[in-house]
Design a protein with these regions (language model features):
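Solenoid-like repeat scaffolds
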Residues: 2-5, 33-40, 70-79, 108-116, ...
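Alpha-helical adaptor scaffolds
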Residues: 9, 13-17, 83-85, 89-93, ...
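TPR alpha-solenoid repeat register
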Residues: 11, 45, 79, 121, ...
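Residue at a conserved register position within TPR or TPR-like alpha-solenoid repeats
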Residues: 19, 53, 95, 128-129, ...
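Structural motif corresponding to the intra-repeat A-B loop/turn of tetratricopeptide repeats
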Residues: 22, 39, 56, 98, ...
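Inward-facing hydrophobic residues that define packing positions of alpha-helical scaffold repeats
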Residues: 32, 66, 101, 108, ...
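TPR/TPR-like (Sel1-like) alpha-helical repeat modules
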Residues: 37-38, 43, 50-74, 135-153, ...
Length: 360
């Protein structure tokens, strides 16, 4: 079929798509590129060429193909914008790993500008700005991204930039970040953690209470924050109950992006490949550490060990933190008449008792 001019296009399409399906990426790239050059209207050639280059981790080449496809209206503009942001970030990540920081920073900043809602680009750009001795530029970039899609990894990056800052400066910078998305859940959790870090538990409860009121099944992250707060209120029994609940509470996908022993968004080339289409086509992040049930970073105050193997409510495995708590004092079970599981409204009642003056 390839030798017959009338059937060449059909044969090339079948061959290229078969090569892509069987993992012969160089062959798929060669056949689809040739077809796309011969027939600029061949949408299949664009799709196959782009997919093969992405699968082969050829980020720069894939971006060039994407630009051509956008010009020929083979891909919608918003999808092209998001895909381009992922491709630039993937290439920036590769350059960063090779120690080529200047071009990596340039690409990451462009990616964050293209898609401020793409947190991995902002986190990488902020990290590279910090390495280049430009913390103010890093802060501004995170603030812009926070206004579009607040993410716990960006909060962590921002706090890293504030390390060693005076209290007044820290307050001013955190306030500036919070104003970018004052009603966002991540903003409230960031402020609650900061209050805990300062030892102002009443203010921390004031921020946490509405979040806990809003859900009947708080996540493991919220349970751990509640446990820390109870501990600081000198309520060890309630703290242990929250630790127990944390072991079986639902995980937060975004929180799993923070590796307790490494970088946030520590993606492999295969992860970047998936992101090109997940974020590029739908605007959704992937969460490899969530999928693999990797250890979680503990939210809140100070450096703490990760929570190993946190599990969903259907699984009975308990975290090390819970086992340590139970070793100190047995925890009453819900069928004990003197005990009941803690709910969000219980915290609200505790908060009210802390904030309201005693009645005479």
């Amino acid at each position: 079929m390839l030798n017959n001019e009338k059937t060449r296009a059909t044969g090339q399409r079948g061959l290229a798509q078969n090569m892509l399906a069987t993992g012969n990426l160089p062959g798929a790239i060669e056949q689809s590129r040739e077809a796309y050059i011969s027939n600029p209207e061949a949408r299949w050639a664009f799709d196959t060429l782009f997919k093969a280059e992405v699968a082969n981790h050829q980020w720069t080449e894939a971006e060039e193909t994407l630009e051509t496809g956008e010009q020929r209206k083979h891909v919608e503009k918003n999808i092209a914008r998001r895909r381009r942001a992922v491709l630039k970030t993937a290439e920036a990540d590769r350059l960063h790993d090779e120690g080529d920081f200047a071009p990596a920073l340039e690409l990451a900043v462009k990616a964050a500008s293209l898609a401020p809602e793409f947190a991995p680009a902002a986190a990488l750009a902020a990290k590279l700005y910090k390495l280049q001795g430009e913390p103010k530029a890093a802060s501004k970039l995170i603030e812009k991204s926070w206004s579009k899609a607040a993410h716990p990894a960006l909060a962590l990056s921002f706090l890293d930039l504030l390390e060693g800052a005076e209290t007044k400066t820290r307050d001013k910078r955190l306030s500036a970040l919070a104003k970018q998305a004052p009603n966002h859940r991540e903003t409230k959790i960031l402020l609650a953690e900061d209050h805990l870090r300062r030892g102002d538990v009443v203010k921390a409860w004031a921020v946490l209470s509405p979040i806990l009121r809003a859900t009947e099944t708080p996540s493991s992250r919220l349970c751990l924050l509640a446990a820390q707060s109870e501990e600081r209120l000198h309520n060890p029994t309630d703290a242990r109950l929250w630790l127990q609940r944390a072991a079986t509470a639902p995980r937060e996908a975004d929180w799993s992006d923070l590796d307790p022993s490494g970088e946030s968004f520590d993606y492999t080339p295969q992860d970047w490949r998936r992101l090109v289409f997940s974020f590029g086509d739908t605007g959704e992040l992937i969460h490899p550490r969530f999928d693999s049930r990797a250890p979680l970073r503990i939210p809140g105050v100070g450096d703490q060990p990760p929570v190993e193997q946190p599990v969903d409510a259907a699984v009975e495995t308990k975290s090390e933190a819970v086992r340590e708590a139970e070793a100190v004092e047995p925890i009453s079970q819900p069928d004990d008449p003197g005990a009941a599981p803690i709910k969000g409204k219980d915290l609200a009642e505790r908060l009210d008792s802390l904030l309201d003056p005693p009645k005479s």
